[in-house]
Amino acid sequence: VHETEPGEFSFEDEADLRHFVQLIGAEGMYCILRPGPYVGASWDLGGLPPWLTTIPGVTLRQSNPAAQGFLEASARFLGAVMEQVKDLQLTAPAPPDTESTLPGGGPIVMMQAEHAWFCHHPAQAQTYLGEIVRYLRENGCEVPIIVGNNFWQRVDGAFDTWSADEHLATDLRQMRLVQPEAPRFVSEVQCGQPDHWGEPHEHRSAAWCLNRLGQILSAGAQYNVHMFHGGTNFGFNGGCSDRSRDALITTSHDCGAPLSEAGDTTPMYWAVKRISMFASQFGQVLA
């Protein structure tokens, strides 16, 4: 979307990231920015531009001699992204003409480097994920950086988050021992899963979601509901799950979200709102 040709960036129209983040602030919401370079299987090639695969012998999402072209492209892309949003971080000075109702320069309170890098390779974790963290910092990221990797690997300069559906209360209590210096944070509480062509829609009830959110709060942790509004994968932007080559994700990315694909409230919305209001009032007690 942002770099359809090498080195040619677009941040206009539907790719206007800066305006989107400003709208978040104008509505009084905070933003966890996930610039990638890989952003998840729901996007075609995880959001990576297809031209990366034309680099001779290239390897993606790694740090080795064959991945040099990928790393150079990642550094260039993250630099362009940070140029758009670095003054929209909560740590930046507030401009006099801001529409944001929040303190600071903007709503960005956290950034995520990469996504779901489930790889048992400590050296790669430091040389690849560590490089992504470095690119963000050197280009002006001042807010905390997370890596949503479920503790497969620790990365200097970032703290890890959790993403799972089961055993949340016990797992999050163990996080206190594994990462005592950082908050316990579930970066993806999935109220539903993406639909795949040729398969029935997976439905998760509001009670199911409430149970998971309750477990998280009981462990003194925080959560981010993903997706809160699923939207639509227009054109050929839908991705593919890793379980098979033909597990293609539909154009609908509703994912059972509290706000439907059309923007309507659902029973899930009212359930999530109720427990979130409770958490906001009793957060100090729960922590």
Walk through the language-model features, giving the residues of each:
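A cross-domain feature marking catalytic cores of carbohydrate-active enzymes
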Residues: 1, 33-37, 113-115, 147-149, ...
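The substrate-binding groove and active-site-proximal loops of carbohydrate-active enzymes
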Residues: 1-15, 53-76, 112-126, 159-166, ...
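Short, solvent-exposed loop/turn and secondary-structure capping segments
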Residues: 5-6, 34-36, 42-47, 123-124, ...
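Aromatic-lined substrate-binding rim segments of carbohydrate-active enzymes
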Residues: 1-46, 50-51, 133-138
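An active-site-proximal structural segment forming one wall of the substrate-binding cleft
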Residues: 13-35, 54-108
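Noncatalytic carbohydrate-binding groove/subsite architecture in carbohydrate-active enzymes
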Residues: 122-216
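Carbohydrate-binding surfaces of carbohydrate-active enzymes
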Residues: 71-85, 89, 97-113, 118-129, ...
